[in-house]
Swiss-Prot record:
NCBIfam families: PS_II_psbZ. The gene is psbZ. This is Photosystem II reaction center protein Z. Keywords: Chloroplast, Membrane, Photosynthesis, Photosystem II, Plastid, Reaction center, Thylakoid, Transmembrane, Transmembrane helix. Its main location: plastid.
Amino acid sequence: MITALTALLVLISLGLIVTVPVALATPGEWENSKSDFTKGFQAWVALVLVIAAADGVASSL
């Protein structure tokens, strides 16, 4: 399970690495899609916390 969550984290990270600079470089794109990127950032942070919690539980067993 932790491996799948880590793979999802890597995919979200790669998506943000590619799309955020493109949105910032395109005139007006950041303002239009700012809420979508905010949701992506929130999902990334939440996934980091879930992976940390899952790893903590798995290592204590």
